[in-house]
Amino acid sequence: MTAVVNIAAYKFVSIANPADLREPMLEQAGQRQLKGTVLLAPEGINLFLAGAADAIEGFLRWLRADARFADLQAKYSESARMPFRKLLVKVKREIIRMDHPAIRPEAGRAPAVDAATLRRWLAQGRELVMLDTRNAFEVEVGTFRGALDWRIERFTQFPQAVRDNQAALAGKTVVSFCMGGIRCEKAAIYMAEAGIEHVYQLEGGILKYFEETDGAGFDGACFVFDERVALDAALAPQA
């Protein structure tokens, strides 16, 4: 059986009229029989799609022909069956809701650490605060060993959690992480703007870490928002 290719991708970039992209996105993804969700907002694009390998690559070529998305990077995994039931393209206020409009990731990112570098830091025992920016129910499925978990129920609670815990992070090196990179990017920017000096974001999130390393230092599986539920370090649905 031919495996279904799954991609997760996002990019913070100004989109003046995101509603104008909805129909072209539906048409291009639909004609390739892709399923999943695409979120569009003035701050950018966030997508989770699945389908045949050539269809996925064809859609990405079409999307990257738009200069705004030319350098969009995708995280890949495979599954034995389609993990989504339908195709949705939605226009939102934010591609990841924080309810903090002053945070504009496209205006400048926090420093990022790539998967291989983080793997090396963890193996060396480097002093890090691994901060899980995901919801509590996601953390319960799996997280980095010893990670800090503020037990938030939704990402809009993250700014208050920073205010409540900021003193404990003073002088420490913080690596924010999440499923695919989008939440940890916003989180890292917020913390840096709040005055936390040494903040990194895990480039591409847990999924990219699994894709590019052996998953060392991560206990359990990564929760995903589709019918696969959770992926292990080999990016296979957890048994």
From Swiss-Prot:
InterPro entries: Rhodanese-like_dom, Rhodanese-like_dom_sf, TrhO, TRHO_N. One of its GO terms (molecular function) is oxidoreductase activity, acting on paired donors, with incorporation or reduction of molecular oxygen. PROSITE patterns: RHODANESE_3. Its EC number is 1.14.-.-. The keyword tRNA processing applies. SMART domains: RHOD. Keywords: Oxidoreductase, tRNA processing. It holds the Pfam family UPF0176_N. It is an enzyme of class 1 (oxidoreductase). The gene is trhO. This is tRNA uridine(34) hydroxylase. Residues 124-214 form the Rhodanese domain. One of its GO terms (biological process) is tRNA modification. Catalyzes oxygen-dependent 5-hydroxyuridine (ho5U) modification at position 34 in tRNAs. Belongs to the TrhO family. It catalyses: uridine(34) in tRNA + AH2 + O2 = 5-hydroxyuridine(34) in tRNA + A + H2O. The active site is at residue 178.
